[in-house]
């Protein structure tokens, strides 16, 4: 399933539009008559990007998750490989998702606490359990 993401920022043309600047109109007075001289329009182009410094931008970059094409977007690489995307992440799926547990974390836990299983066994007691009685405290007051 391929999903195209429209993004107005990514669709901007990389070329900066040219700015047209007009020279001011100059007025000259000849013999009491005012004549106007107009200068020709000049085009000034301003670019802030240095050539061969910025990465090439690909309009149709493909995003793969578990070997399946999940969306098409723009980016500096032709294709991206991701482990989690909004289609399989529990945060976005809500009640439809199963609990996602990373197997590596479970294995780390088992390795770390493998030796504690012998210590952590709870002994089974047989017979009566006798609780010690509490000692009564003396009357409250000042001692002399």
From Swiss-Prot:
Named from the GO MF annotations, one term is: structural constituent of ribosome
Which GO terms of type biological process are on file? Answer: translation
Output the superkingdom of the source species. Answer: Eukaryota
Q: Which SUPFAM superfamilies match?
A: L28p-like
Q: Which Pfam families match?
A: Ribosomal_L31
Q: Where in the cell is it found?
A: Plastid, Chloroplast
Assigned GO CC terms: chloroplast; chloroplast envelope; chloroplast stroma; mitochondrion; ribonucleoprotein complex; ribosome
Where does the transit peptide start and end? 1-48
Answer whether the UniProt record assigns the keyword rRNA-binding to this protein.
yes
Question: Which InterPro entries does this chain map to?
Answer: Ribosomal_bL28/bL31-like_sf, Ribosomal_bL31, Ribosomal_bL31_sf
Annotated keywords: Chloroplast, Plastid, Ribonucleoprotein, Ribosomal protein, RNA-binding, rRNA-binding, Transit peptide
Subunit field text: Part of the 50S ribosomal subunit.
Q: Which NCBIfam families match?
A: L31
Its function?
Binds the 23S rRNA.
Which protein family is it in? Belongs to the bacterial ribosomal protein bL31 family. Type A subfamily.
Record PANTHER family: 50S RIBOSOMAL PROTEIN L31, CHLOROPLASTIC (PTHR33280), LARGE RIBOSOMAL SUBUNIT PROTEIN BL31C (PTHR33280:SF1)
- The protein's name is Large ribosomal subunit protein bL31c
- Gene name tied to this protein: RPL31
């Amino acid at each position: 399933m391929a999903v195209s993401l429209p993004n107005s920022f990514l669709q901007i043309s990389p070329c900066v539009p040219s700015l047209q600047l007009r020279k001011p109109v100059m007025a000259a007075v000849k013999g009491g008559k005012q004549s106007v001289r107009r200068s020709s329009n000049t085009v000034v182009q301003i670019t802030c990007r240095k050539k061969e410094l910025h990465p090439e931008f690909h309009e149709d970059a493909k995003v793969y998750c578990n070997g399946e094409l999940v969306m098409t977007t723009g980016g500096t690489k032709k294709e991206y490989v991701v482990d989690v995307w909004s289609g399989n992440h529990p945060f976005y799926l809500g009640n439809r998702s199963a609990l996602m547990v990373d197997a590596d974390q479970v294995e780390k836990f088992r390795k770390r606490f493998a030796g504690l299983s012998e210590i952590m066994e709870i002994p089974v007691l047989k017979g009566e359990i006798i609780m010690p009685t509490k000692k009564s405290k003396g009357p409250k007051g000042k001692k002399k």
